[in-house]
Amino acid sequence: MDSEVKERFARNILKMVAPGTALRTGIDNVLRAKTGGLIVLGYNENMKGIVDGGFYLDCPFSPASLYELAKMDGAIILNEDGTKILYANTQLNPDNAISSNETGIRHRTAERVAKQTGNLVISISQRRNVITLYHGHLRYALRDIGVILTKANQAIQTLDKYKSVLDQDITDLGALEFEELVTFHEVSQVMQRIHMVLNIKGEILNYVNELGSEGRLITMQLNELVSNLEKEVLLLIQDYAKEDDVDPEDVLEQMMKCSNEELLDDSNILKLLGYHKAFNVQEQQATPRGYRILHKIPRLPATIVRNLVHSFENINDMLRADLKELDEVEGIGEARAKLIKDGLSRIQEQLFMDRNI
């Protein structure tokens, strides 16, 4: 399962059967009763051709109803979002020519129905105590909550370590910006770290989707660790992209499609930023526009930040400018000019104190 398909599967499918949902409660009841079961979500044209027998219900879904109906041998068909029970005790006759790697009759039928219809099919094993999801050509066995929680907590610890390193790299980059010593190597290094941190965040979100109501604490820890990271990276892209009118969200989306190995090559990051001419990243100086640092000044609207960036070439030009020069920028009065001047000095002082020497 590639990362994009896996993310979509976790977001759309695993959420439906996550702990805390009515559907998962019903499935767990069937699992504990050891009756086994076959549940299909969706009754489209493809389904009509393979359903045989059973009886039509069209009643609201409830865990208790699912539990009782699973005592019968046939499959249960729900509507697409699992809020209604449409049919019960039906026999499913998918095309036998469709390949299946499963051995048990129930699981083999489930896999073929999923491949033939594209619907979500849930197979509850009678003997093995396993819940298996089939969706199109995808197969996924639901794991024990304890196992997922352990993996999620390990991922949070890993994220915490990577985020600490990233925070220090961003601080060091800020200090170098004020010293006008930034090269594209430092920019690439920060982008690589951001990519790794966002990948770990994506993994944790997949766990959260599968954990459902059991994942609240994991979600809180995740938000605490990476709440402003996307904003930080978008501003970083605006600072260092070749063209000022680049769409930073598009650059970020392209970056997240790259593998860690691809981004270890600095030239790939430079291409994402719009630089196609090869140069020595260790020596080539990079001048930030100032979006990221200016956004750290409280009560400074985005329009004012844009006006400042267009009026001055970089942060240091703003820092060196006197109050009169700042006042001349559109939308900046005397009070705001003083706010900007004091804010930049304070940020510079803090960065120099926190940098890794």
From Swiss-Prot:
ATP binds at residues 74, 92, 105-109. Keywords: ATP-binding, DNA damage, DNA repair, DNA-binding, Magnesium, Nucleotide-binding, Nucleotidyltransferase, Transferase. Its EC number is 2.7.7.85. It catalyses: 2 ATP = 3',3'-c-di-AMP + 2 diphosphate. GO terms for biological process: DNA repair. Residues 7-145 form the DAC domain. It is an enzyme of class 2 (transferase). One of its GO terms (molecular function) is ATP binding. It holds the Pfam family DAC. Its cofactor is Mg(2+). Belongs to the DisA family. HAMAP family: DisA. Participates in a DNA-damage check-point that is active prior to asymmetric division when DNA is damaged. DisA forms globular foci that rapidly scan along the chromosomes during sporulation, searching for lesions. When a lesion is present, DisA pauses at the lesion site. This triggers a cellular response that culminates in a temporary block in sporulation initiation. Homooctamer. This is DNA integrity scanning protein DisA. The gene is disA.
